[in-house]
Regions:
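Walker A/P-loop
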Residues: 1-13, 23-26
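Motif I (Walker A/P-loop) of helicase-class P-loop NTPases
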Residues: 6-16, 32, 115
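Loop/turn-to-beta-strand initiation segments
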Residues: 20-23, 45, 69-73, 93-96, ...
Length: 190
């Protein structure tokens, strides 16, 4: 699915219908904070653990996920390797494991992150928990690599076209680039 194509709703709605907490692995702190803020704004208990937090803050958030009725926990792939995370995660009732930006797991991907390779180990700690991998950018080779590295038994792929009706590419030839740019910007709302 393309960026802005509704990937978050593909896991948020099912997780809300299930008992337990949904762990979302994502590499971007800004995205974590944005998602948590949006969920909290509509009354859904969500939290994120990211670099810069103290050990005590991390432990508090993890304990809140065990005992506090949280529905969503956003973490970086690097966090999955820590002992404290693994110990606390085993005490959680995890209903869904989501890997966002899953193209980062593939060495064929443009944005490979070695820490994503540890996600398969997390699957071993959460037997029977469904896993969903999401990305807006994956070639067929990367899709296959994602499925192999995450040990998917059944390979289900849902794709949406990158073509967006609300986007257009136009080439304008002009001698006066600055005035043309100012004119175009004046026509664009926002």
């Amino acid at each position: 699915m393309p960026t802005g194509g509704g990937k978050s709703i593909t896991f948020q709605v099912p997780a809300l219908a299930m008992e337990g907490i949904c762990i979302v692995v994502t590499p971007l702190i800004a995205l974590m904070k944005d998602q948590v803020e949006n969920l909290r704004r509509i009354g859904i208990k969500a939290t994120a653990i990211y670099s810069g937090m103290s050990r005590q803050e991390i432990i508090t958030q993890l304990e809140n996920c065990i005992f506090g009725g949280y529905k969503f926990l956003y973490v970086s792939p690097e966090r999955l390797s820590t002992d404290i995370f693994r110990i606390k995660m085993e005490a959680m009732q995890v209903c869904l494991l989501v890997i966002d930006e899953s193209h980062c797991i593939s060495q064929w991907g443009y944005d490979f992150r070695p820490s994503y390779l540890n996600i398969a180990e997390i699957r071993d700690l959460l037997p029977g928990v469904p896993v969903l991998a999401l990305t807006a950018t994956a070639t067929p080779e990367v899709v296959n690599d994602i499925q192999e590295r995450l040990r998917f038994k059944e390979k289900n792929v849902f794709q949406k076209s990158f073509a967006r009706k609300n986007l257009a590419y136009i080439v304008r030839k002009t001698e006066d680039k600055l005035n043309t740019l100012v004119y175009i910007l004046g026509k664009v709302p926002g």
